Amino acid sequence: MAYSNFIIDFTLTDTAPVTEPVTLAEAKLYCRVTTSVDDNQISLMIKQAREAVEVGTGLSLIPKTAVVWFTNWNSAFELPYGPVNSITSLINEQGDTIAVGDYTLIGGKFPKLIRPSYQNLKFTYTCGYTTIPNDLKIAILDQVSYDYENRGLDSNTGICEKT
């Protein structure tokens, strides 16, 4: 079943100091780098690769707080980032808090909120993995390796074709 959200506004904020899912040591080992000359550059590449994977998958790899204002004619709302860790609040357009028993959260990685009546809602929740799945970690490492191998090229480099 397809859901058709209309997201009115959306913010995504890191909930704590960011600890990247791939360490500098892991990235250097994967890229076969033995010196520390490029450590700063590789650290930036790790962050960029993680952000690219998050955008490409719609998943939050590190803990974040999401605040979404949205509306939907069929009362089923696709949340823009998963997995959901906890629900902070669900508020209707009048500013009233909606009780936990009045909605259902379904799904894991790509959650949906089911609400029995149509209206605009503000949903605040925390999302992100506590342990990153290996396939996503490899995707980050592949992207870092690709970026590192192609650094300094004049052409526009994009997403690693391997993943």
Regions found by a protein language model. Name each.
Residues M1-T163:
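Divalent metal-cofactor coordination and adjacent catalytic microenvironments
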